[in-house]
Amino acid sequence: MRVDNNPKIDTLINQLDLGDHISIFRQFFSRESSLYIEGDQELHYRYIKALDAIEFKAPPKVSDFTNIKFHLKKQGVLQFEQIFEIVKVVRYFRYFQNRELEGIIGEWMNKFLIEPKFLEVERYFTHEGKFDENLDETLFHLGSRVKEHKANINESLKRLTSSQKLSPYLIDSQVHLINDEECLLVRGGFNHVLKGAMVGRSSSGGFYVSPDVILKTKEQIRYINEEREAIFYSYAKEFSSKLCELLPFINFIDKEFTKFDNYQARVLFAKSRDLKLIKSKKDSKIVLEGFIHPALHNAKPTSVNFSKNILMITGVNAGGKTMLLKSILSAAFMAKYIIPMKLNEHKSHIGGFKQVLAIIDDPQNVKNDISTFAGRMQEFSKIFECRDARSEERR
């Protein structure tokens, strides 16, 4: 999955004071993704608007499938956590299928045909992603034995805390879990009445001790857990083998989920902040009505008509000229990436631009005798040079 790693885009976002807005927007994604949606923008916008017309729950956080698919291609064994990442995506698409939606969203969801072989894997995972040991008789009995042994350990420790010989050395009567070891917290000199291994020290100088009396029971638990792990691994091998055969299906849902994630993030972000979804048109005209830059608080809406070749902005110092320029460029940038913004979507019109370049920062340099005007002319010159160079390459 391609993610944004473009210093120029990051610089532009900072220049336009969109950093916080984009950061909040990214939080709505289920997994890390590019801001730009590859492909037919008109078609993407249709899906986004169709999704915007319905209420739905946000997808769960999902990991990237790159390593998962790589392991399956090499016929490797996936961990249960990796398998559950696939299960989460399938269950989320099933949630949409069960709603029996009409229109393009319903048609899209009907494309997800879940193989019976996948259901054989999915049924072993609970809603929280835990392996359901109740479905395996051996695992169920082993789990019951572990619970019994742990109960015996607790009983043994309780008897120790009630011991009159040990009582003078006990700092408290609780059972502490240190490094997965059940321990008692005792004072120095405990070795006269208690045999055990010291696991750690408390901040008050006490000793965390795991008594020898529970050592045999803990060893039995370790043996049982090793047996359980062997069974878990056999299941992981079996599941991975089945998923390997379903790799085309996994590739498909991975690609479609990335697309859906881009759509839902925009829709839910817009709904959460009462923002509008607007995409760039196929011309170069910019008409903003009721636009508010996301970095401004309690701001008055901006309206501007930039339908001619040149727009002249004048005003006194600290009169908002730079912020107006940032607003125009921000609107163009957000429309290009279909990022929700605050404006009157019915009266606004934002053209499409291959690139958005901002010459905003004050380039004045006293040492090199460069004024603000001269510095900005240099920036314009660099842009024109790049454009001319690309024109020469096309020839």
Walk through the language-model features, giving the residues of each:
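ATPase nucleotide-binding head domains, primarily ABC-like/P-loop NTPase cores
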Residues: 273, 281-395
